[in-house]
Amino acid sequence: LTKTTGVFDATTVAAVRSFRDKWGFYGEPIVTAGVFKRLDVLTHNHGHLPKACLTPKKVICVDMTQRVLRLVQLRKTVLTTDARFGTSQNPTVKGVFKVYRKDVRHVSSAYKTPMPYSMFFNGGSAVHFSPYFLADGYYGASHGCVNIRDLAVAKRLFRVTSIGTPVVIYAS
């Protein structure tokens, strides 16, 4: 989180747009009771981690409700980034998995799309950078993978993640 500056500048405008895109707040310039209730539901358990994430080991924790991926080490969040998931036709499966394969330049054989910095955790499902998520934001979806839109974060996560690292996917 950043400090409040009292200035509504280009950085603030970009942050508000990003928030609106992530949560679908359009045409709602006034915080009504309904908007406030939605905000409360979305942020009520912000940062709450399930027991499977609170181990002495390094864990990739993916909260599908908050739409974030957190890297947790020694029971503390050391990295947080936006994430997006599959659709009802191609869902991202909830559960506890382990990274079993890493591929820096993977291309999907099923969809012929790039999946750079892939960390596979369940069959063909992986945590990976998505140039489409970067370009389209939350308007698109994956085919069951966990997409990361920040390339630098994906590279860092790939570098510090080992085979066998737990991946916990849940809804808070």
Feature names for model-found ranges:
Residues 48-87:
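A structural motif detector for short, solvent-exposed N-terminal "entry" segments of globular domains
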Residues 69, 99, 119:
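Conserved hydrophobic/aromatic pocket- or pore-lining residues that grip, position, or stack substrates
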Residues 80-82, 96-98, 166:
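Well-ordered beta-strand positions in beta-sheet-rich domains
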Residues 26-27, 45-55, 90-94, 103-172:
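Exported/periplasmic cell-wall-interacting domains
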Residues 13, 17, 36, 66, ...:
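Extracytoplasmic/secreted envelope proteins and their assembly/folding machinery
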